[in-house]
Amino acid sequence: RIVDTHHQPVDFANVALLNVSDSSLITGGVTNENGQFVIPCEVKKAIVKVSCVGYKTYCNAYRTGEVGAITLEDATINLQKVVIKGHRKYISRENGKLTLDVQNSNLKNIGKATDVIKYIPGMLYTNGKYEVFGKGEPVIYIDGRKQTNTSGLSLLSSTNVKSVQLITNPGAEYDAETRSVINITTVHHSLDGLSGIVGAEISKHKNLSNNEEVNLNIHKGALDVFLAYQYDNTRSDIRYDVNQFNYEQDTFHEISASEYSDRSRSHDYNVGMNYAINKNHTIGGRYLGSISNYKMLDSPFDYMQTYKNDELLTSTDNKTEESEKERFHNVNLYYIGKLTDNLQLNLDADYVYAQLKHKQQVSETSRIDAVSEITHMQNDQRNRATALKGVFAWNMNKNNRLDFGTDFSKISSWGMSVNEEGKIADDQFKNKETKYAGFATFRLSASKWKGSIGLRYEYIHAINTDQGEVKNKTNYSDLLPSLSLSTMFGRVGMNLDFSSRVSRPSFRQLNNSVSYNNQYHYEQGNIYLKPQYVYDTELSVNYSIFDFKLDYQYIKDYIHPTVVAVSGKPGTVTWMSTNAKDFQQLGAQCVVSPVFGCWRPTLTVGVYKPYFTLSYNGEQLDYNHPYGLFAFQNVVALRNDWLFRCDFFWNIKGHHGIYEQNGYSSFNMMVQKQLLKKKLTITLKAEDLFDSSKLNDVKRVNFVVQNRKVNNFNRCIIASISYNFNSFKDKYNGSGSAEDEINRF
């Protein structure tokens, strides 16, 4: 392993093995991002020569298999006070993967990992959720460990992020439901003692919210113990304006407007350890828990008017009381072992338990006769999963590698929904699913060409029970290939990727539990919902500061929202998910990322053209309007550790499935100052300055057309302060084996 004088890994260093007798070249290689290298060699002793730009060349003789860690010294040249400055490219693409070099850019001091992710070209951030343009919500990993929520991201300082990688066409090694991946690699520290980070944040939307965190790490020799805790108190407000027409038989016209103020309090905690038995074997464990409580505090107004054939049918003032309690527990154990010089084994075991209790009371008072009607709903859902995963990595030779492995999971979800008034039938449901999976990926490198071919097999046995009766019993058997091929033509890089994925319904989409919104509007699961299959092909080309990508997606059994009439209740509908025959879309994206001194702008422009048709009001309707993205992000690093950020995002109008979404935008600014040798960071942000991120969409399906306007009151001011000592790093090495199951919960 090659490291610098600060014990940081040196990547892309050239390693040559020379003959001891005459210093002739035997073979060679290049270090990876962890500073590691594996060079098959038949001689018992050789001279190891290591060279890298910015470091002194290192030479020494070693016996085969006894090299250990090699430290490179910085190469310093005095040029009589002449200062030469260069700017390293911080956005790059290799083998189809887009990488941000955080440590060698101004993003290093941007704040937290949550802020770094926003700077990935093509990344959208709306109402607390990340979305890859044209791909949906990504799965996020930190050092190979799946993140089940954003707590791990918010606890990770950007100073401890080495790089961020976006994979938009994951290979066979990733779970079949993963459509895009964000891999965060952190900076590794080897100092013994106590390290950590403490921080606090306060934000003002319509109401005040606050967040406090502490993260501690104790490292001593081969033992590493970590502890993290975060408290979050979020106040949020939201307004809905809905205009809906129901043309099933008579024409029902619903006009409603509502505004809610709520509070969510959560406690997140993480404790674990790593222990290096020796240089070849490491074990560890982790417990991750979360307790969250949600409560609706106020509803300034909530009214609805319903017309039947243009005659007023009802006019009501509504009052909603709602609360949720959620508990989450995850235990993970892992082993990482180097079995031989060329073979490594990773083992993970997981146990997950989650519980959600939801209570709702809706009071509807008529404006016509002042009669009140109260509806109580109570839902209780529990989820349990056990999972095992094993992965082998076999370096066959210097050009070829084979990764193969298997995983197993058994998950169950059960619960009930109760309506005291008997308006909606009570329900008890239970879903069970057992999964067996295996995969293999062969990677090769020859001259200017690099590639990989992968194959993943998954077998699923699922049983859905409602009211004690088996409603659906299904076996899924899927063989999912993937392919990647990349090359260079001079300074032009090209990459072709293909992947096949499957997206299975969440348990909420499958269960028969009913959510009551009002007397004309219910929401419910669909136990007959089938998985959707995604076939994705990408071609990417990069040159200098330019990166261009073409993408074609074909989705079989496409999952989308639909509406059905409620029997015996004219004008009342239930929204649920269903399958369409297929869905297609063709997209393009261009990223330009130049550097002008202290200013690093990034321009991203993208467009997707969908091809989708459904039945609406007895006729076939096309949902084919293209949608787009325009983003202009700017970071300016000033003297004395001042940082300034100014970003503009514009989501351009178009069809997202059955939704025709109007355009919306956001303009954000940030000022940051670092003190005490960059250990203390003070940040002030202003987000959605022009209050232009309000959502407005229209959905037409079956016999219903609904226009919805949503205001999340995103305009806000945020102030935060954090203090780092010894550059904290959570060094947990487990990857987790239940990522798919946790995501579906």
Where are these regions (language model features)?
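Surface-exposed extracellular loop regions of Gram-negative outer-membrane beta-barrel proteins
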Residues: 185-200, 239, 243, 255, ...
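Short acidic/polar hinge/loop motifs at secondary-structure boundaries
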Residues: 119, 145-171
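Outer-membrane beta-barrel signature, preferentially recognizing the C-terminal barrel domain
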Residues: 430-433, 471-474, 502-556, 574-587, ...
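Short, acidic, small-residue-rich periplasmic hinge/interaction motif at the N-terminus
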Residues: 16-18, 49-56, 65-106, 126-127, ...
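N-terminal periplasmic accessory domains that precede
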Residues: 65-72, 113-116, 150-151, 166, ...
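Face-selective signature of the C-terminal outer-membrane beta-barrel domain
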Residues: 268-293, 318-467, 488, 492-493, ...
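Outer membrane beta-barrel strand-and-loop segments of large Gram-negative receptors
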Residues: 385-389, 435-437, 530, 536, ...
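Short, acidic Ser/Thr/Gly-rich low-complexity loop/linker segments typical of extracellular
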Residues: 21-36
